[in-house]
Amino acid sequence: MAELLASLPAWAAVLLLFFATVSGSTGPRSRENRGASRIPSQFSEEERVAIKEALKGAIQIPTVSFSHEESNTTALAEFGEYIRKAFPTVFHSSLVQHEVVAKYSHLFTIQGSDPSLQPYMLMAHIDVVPAPEEGWEVPPFSGLERNGFIYGRGALDNKNSVMAILHALELLLIRNYSPKRSFFIALGHDEEVSGEKGAQKISALLQARGVQLAFLVDEGSFILEGFIPNLEKPVAMISVTEKGALDLMLQVNMTPGHSSAPPKETSIGILSAAVSRLEQTPMPNMFGGGPLKKTMKLLANEFSFPINIVLRNLWLFHPIVSRIMERNPITNALVRTTTALTMFNAGIKVNVIPPLAQATINCRIHPSQTVHEVLELVKNTVADDRVQLHVLRSFEPLPISPSDDQAMGYQLLQETIRSVFPEVDIVVPGICIANTDTRHYANITNGMYRFNPLPLNPQDFSGVHGINEKVSVQNYQNQVKFIFEFIQNADTYKEPVPHLHEL
C-alpha cells in the first residue's frame, strides 16, 4: 500500500496542468461520415510559407487587453485591417458576410447550400494579455521564427486560432469550396478581460436574429504530451464545461482613531481573521460529483499496476484518491471550488486606526455547485456580522455539453483529431478550470466545446500568459489543416440513428 500511495501523488499532481481535466469515453475510430468528394488538405510550399508568415504578422500587432476599461484600441483597429489584407478571398467571397461588432470584434457568416442543416460556430479571440519584455528570448511582439518555432504573445493564446480559422477558410474558398452547412466565425476582442464588450455583443446579435447553433468550438484543451507520468501516449482533451466564478469584496468599517489608544480589534484585524478562516476552511471536496471520477475509470486501462487497480476500483479507493487530489494546487482545483485572496487594501497612516479595510476574493466554482451555494458557504465561514460581503461579479458554471455518440460537435472533433493526428488514440472530454468566451453563447447552443488542435507539452504550456510563448511552425500548419478538414467533415456528417430509448 505504501508503494501504491507513493505512485499516485506524482500522477495526480500533474493530471492536468493546462486548465482542464478529463472525463468521458475514448470511443472507436470512425470515418464513415466522410463524403466521397473532398478537397485534400495538401498545401503547396508557397501556401505553407504564407500560413506561417500570416501568423507572424498577426503577433506583431499588440492587441493587449489591460483591464475591463483599458485596451489597445489602435492595435485592435489595425488588426481588423490586417486580416482584410491577409485573407482577400474571405472578404470578397459572395458566400461570406462580414460584420464588425462593437467596433473591434468580427462576425463572419458563411452561407451553406442546404438551409435544412443547423449551423455551427468556430470561435477565437483577438486580444492578448500584457507581455513585459523581461525574460523573453525575443521581443514578445516580434513574431520571430527560431528553430522551427514562432515566438510572441498570442502564439498559443489565441492569435493562432484566429489566423488558423481564417486561413483554412481562405484556402477552401480559393479551391472553390462551397459549404453545405452554414457556419459562423466569431472573433471577440476582449476575452482576456471578460468578453462582455465582444463575445457578449456577438451573442446578443445572433440571438436577436433567432440563431440556434448545433454546437460551437472555442479555445480550451490541447493534445497533451508528457503531462501524465507513466502514460506515453498523447491525450486529446475536449473541454465540455468550465467553472463558474464569484468575485467578492469583504469590507469592514470602523470609527477611526489615534494609534496611541487602539481598540481591542481594528478593521484590519477583523478582516484578516475573516480571510484567514476562508483560507483555512476550503470548500467541500466534490470528487465523484463531476465527470472526473468517470474519466479516471476510463483511463485505467492505459496505466500499469498499481495505478490501474486503483482507478478501476474507485468505489474502494475514492477517499484516498480524493485526498491525494487535494495535495496539489492544480488537481485541488479539479475537485472543489477554489477561494483565492487576490487584493487587500487598508490603512492611511502609520499612527491612524484605519476606518476601512477591504479584501477581494476570487472563487472558481466547481460544476457541481452554484453561485448561491458558494456564497452561503462563504458567509457561514466568515461568520462575523461586522464583515460586509459585496458581490462584484458572478456567473454559474456552464452546463456539461454532451459527448456521447449522438453529440455532433464532439463526434466531429473526435473524427478530425484522429484523421489529422493518427498517433492520437485517446480522445476524452474535460473540464476547463479557466474561463472562455463560450459562456456568452449558452443561450444559443447546448454543445459548447473547447479544444485547440495543437500538441502541447509542459514546457510550451509555461509560455501561455508567461514568457517565451511560442508555437511550432509544423504544429500551427497542422492546426490550419485540422480546421480545413473539420469544415468539410461538418458538411458530410450523418445524423446518428437514435438510441432505442429515444424513439
From Swiss-Prot:
* Gene Ontology BP annotations: adaptive thermogenesis; amide biosynthetic process; amide catabolic process; amino acid metabolic process; energy homeostasis; fatty acid metabolic process; lipid metabolic process; proteolysis
Report the co-factor binding details. Answer: Binds 2 Zn(2+) ions per subunit.
- Residues recorded as binding Zn(2+) 2, renumbered to this chain, are H125, D157, D218
This entry's Gene Ontology molecular function terms read: aminoacylase activity; hydrolase activity, acting on carbon-nitrogen (but not peptide) bonds, in linear amides; lyase activity; metal ion binding; peptidase activity
Where on this chain does Zn(2+) 1 bind?
D157, E192, H465
Which GO CC annotations does the UniProt entry carry?
extracellular space
The cellular location(s) given in this protein's UniProt record come to: Secreted
Pathway entry? Amino-acid metabolism; Energy metabolism; electron transfer; Lipid metabolism; fatty acid metabolism
Q: Cite the Gene3D superfamilies for this sequence.
A: 1.10.150.900, 3.30.70.360, Zn peptidases
Q: Which reaction does it catalyse?
A: an N-acyl-L-amino acid + H2O = an L-alpha-amino acid + a carboxylate; an N-acyl-aromatic L-alpha-amino acid + H2O = an aromatic L-alpha-amino acid + a carboxylate; N-(5Z,8Z,11Z,14Z)-eicosatetraenoyl-glycine + H2O = (5Z,8Z,11Z,14Z)-eicosatetraenoate + glycine; N-hexadecanoyl-L-phenylalanine + H2O = hexadecanoate + L-phenylalanine
Recount the UniProt induction comment for this entry.
Up-regulated in adipose tissue upon cold exposure.
Tissues/organs with expression: In addition to being detected in blood (at protein level), PM20D1 is also highly expressed in other tissues including brown adipocytes, liver and kidney. It is also expressed in small intestine, large intestine, heart and pancreas.
Q: Which UniProt keywords apply?
A: Glycoprotein, Hydrolase, Lipid metabolism, Lyase, Metal-binding, Protease, Secreted, Signal, Zinc
The signal peptide here is: 1-24
Give the observed phenotype of the deletion mutant. Genetic ablation causes tissue-specific bidirectional dysregulation of several N-acyl amino acids. Locomotor activity and resting energy requirements (RER) are slightly increased and decreased, respectively, in PM20D1-KO mice on chow diet, while diet-induced obesity conditions produce a marked impairment in glucose homeostasis and insulin sensitivity in these mice. They also exhibit enhanced defense of body temperature in cold, and antinociceptive behaviors selectively in response to chemical and inflammatory pain stimuli while maintaining normal thermal pain sensation and normal movement.
Characterize the regulation of its activity.
Lipoproteins are powerful coactivators of PM20D1 activity in vitro and NAA biosynthesis in vivo.
What family does this belong to? Belongs to the peptidase M20A family.
Q: Other remarks?
A: Overexpression in mice blunts high fat diet-induced increase in fat mass and associated weight gain. Free NAAs represent the biologically active form of these circulating molecules, and the circulating NAAs bioactivity is determined by plasma protein binding.
Record PANTHER family: N-FATTY-ACYL-AMINO ACID SYNTHASE/HYDROLASE PM20D1, N-FATTY-ACYL-AMINO ACID SYNTHASE_HYDROLASE PM20D1
* Protein name per Swiss-Prot or TrEMBL: N-fatty-acyl-amino acid synthase/hydrolase PM20D1
